[in-house]
A protein has these predicted regions:
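Central helical "cap/lid" subdomain
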Residues: 64-113
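Well-ordered beta-strand positions
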Residues: 49, 59, 66, 90, ...
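A short alpha-helix-loop-beta-strand transition element characteristic
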Residues: 1, 88-91, 179
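General beta-strand structural signal in soluble alpha/beta enzymes
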Residues: 39-41, 60, 72, 182-183
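Active-site lid/adjacent beta-loop-alpha segment flanking the redox-cofactor pocket in flavoenzymes
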Residues: 103-199
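Flavin (FAD/FMN) cofactor-binding and adjacent substrate-gating region
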Residues: 1-41, 47-54, 59, 127
Length: 199
């Protein structure tokens, strides 16, 4: 499948894996509840209380939760949420694009994920077709305040002009994409650091 004519080096990681984010979240929730944790969904955070430089509580739309520790898992609102505790977190939300093809003949359901860091793309199998995604170096920033506080699990408008250079790179690496029927282009917000690395 892969055009490797211009590849000078590669890494094969047969022990790597892929996790379904929704399944992982459900498993973590189940495990936490079995150990006594209480989960409050759809509960907006309005502030983080501190005392002597340490967390002592979280203010929510339903009242205050006393706690000495928090896990900042607020995605595109991470910068704003951390600021409630006086902490600067170097993340900013950007549009994140990926394309799905319709099923392709002979497509293996367990293909390894192809990451081409020089071309800022990743490709993997998805429901009999392919998923082509990108982590471009100059992402399109989003002001999270423009999305609204109830924004969750929604998509942003398509932008084929922005995705076109990534698609060209993907077709170079995987020529089968040139004739692959496109199912859809998706655009959802993700948080990124200025250098693209993890925190």
């Amino acid at each position: 499948l892969m055009n490797s004519d211009d590849v000078l080096g590669a890494v094969w990681s047969p022990d790597d894996g892929r996790v379904s984010p929704s399944d992982l979240c459900a498993a973590l929730t189940k495990g936490a509840k079995s150990r006594g944790a209480r989960i409050f969904e759809q509960t907006g955070v309005t502030g983080i209380r501190t005392k002597n430089g340490r967390i002592c509580g979280v203010e929510t739309i339903n009242g205050v939760i006393k706690t000495e520790k928090i896990a900042l898992c607020t995605g595109l609102w991470s910068r704003k949420a951390a600021a409630m505790a006086g902490v600067k977190v170097p993340v900013w939300p950007c549009e994140h694009f990926y394309l799905l093809t319709k099923p392709l003949p002979g497509m293996d359901a367990n293909l390894p994920t192809l990451s081409d860091h020089d071309r800022h793309l990743y490709i993997r199998d998805d429901s009999g077709g392919l998923l082509v995604g990108c982590f471009e170096p100059m992402g399109k920033p989003i002001d999270p305040d423009c999305l609204g506080e109830d924004f969750a699990f929604q998509l942003l408008p398509e932008d084929w002009d922005h995705f076109e250079p990534i698609m060209r790179n993907a077709m170079h690496r995987l020529p089968i994409l040139e004739d692959a029927p496109i199912k859809m282009l998706l655009n959802g917000p993700e948080s990124f650091t200025p250098d693209g690395n993890f925190l």
